[in-house]
Regions:
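Hydrophobic small-molecule pocket/channel-lining residues, especially in calycin-type beta-barrels
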Residues: 2-9, 17, 21-262
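Active-site bordering "gate/hinge" segments
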Residues: 13
Length: 262
């Protein structure tokens, strides 16, 4: 066989292989198409109108040991210190504090994974919804943790209403806000129920339950996020994104809100 014919046969075989391969990829892509009609309309940007703290009155059930740490942190902040706040040392907020973000968040639903893209220091969360089990071996903790979730149709209408999430393997050091005690690696489990308000579909709720040795019982808080019409994102009514006031004024407000909570 001549050299030219050999090259021609090789090129033909390569072309057939590419067509078969691309056909498999396209078939796999078609099988991964998601029916967005079954999911809640959570497009657009979501933000918070409160300062970068848990809502006033949501008191954490601290053990006596950690209550003493909180009081010492409040006293230190009152005299100009940083208290227990790890973000003053440039650590990421971590879970669940990153859900207190004051910058917009976008939620993206894909087959098998739901993403939360948070503009504040470019945090992101990957919530696996592909039915996987928890890893049998320990995995390296990260500040966002390892999240497994499932979409639930609570009212039986054939459409999903709630995203239930559990997050483990959360890295430390981190605090839940600017004053609460510091948590280290793998000390917390976070459970969430994320859903749209039925009466106000431009409001997203996140029921966050924290299980941690610093608390006498699981602690549940509820955070609310209005929908923002963020540039480049489809969404609801146009709103301006609030920005907290940092510095001494912000610190005083923080201390005041925590004192009201305790």
């Amino acid at each position: 066989m001549s050299r030219r014919r050999c090259i021609g046969v090789f090129a033909l075989a390569l072309g057939i292989g590419l067509v078969i391969g691309l056909g498999g990829v396209m078939s796999d892509a078609r099988s991964q198409i998601i029916d967005m009609g079954k999911y809640p309309n959570i497009a657009g940007g979501w933000g918070r109108s409160e300062v970068y703290q848990w809502a006033r009155g949501q008191k954490p059930p601290l053990t006596p040991e950690y209550q003493a740490v909180l009081e010492a942190s409040i006293a230190d902040r009152a005299t100009g210190g940083h208290g227990t706040d790890t973000m003053y040392r440039c650590f990421p907020p971590g879970m669940p504090r990153q859900m207190l973000m004051y910058s917009p968040m976008e939620i993206v639903i894909t087959p098998g994974t739901t993403y939360m893209l948070i503009d504040h220091i470019h945090d992101d969360r990957r919530i696996y919804t592909d039915g996987r089990a928890w890893p049998q071996e320990d995995i390296e903790p990260t500040y966002s943790g390892y999240s497994i979730g499932k979409w639930v149709d609570e009212d039986g209408d054939g459409k999903y209403d709630v995203l239930e999430v559990e997050t483990r393997f959360i890295k430390g050091p981190r605090t839940l806000d600017g004053l609460l005690p510091t948590h280290q690696d793998n000390q917390s489990i976070v459970k969430e129920r994320i859903y749209l308000d039925k009466a106000k579909p431009d409001v997203l709720h996140d029921e966050i339950t924290l299980i941690d040795h610093a608390y006498t019982r699981p602690w549940t808080v509820i955070e609310n996020y209005p929908r923002y019409k963020t540039p480049g994102l489809p969404g609801g009514p146009k709103r301006s994104v609030p920005r907290p006031k940092f510095g001494s004024t912000w610190a005083r407000k923080t201390i005041f809100s925590v004192r009201m909570a305790i």
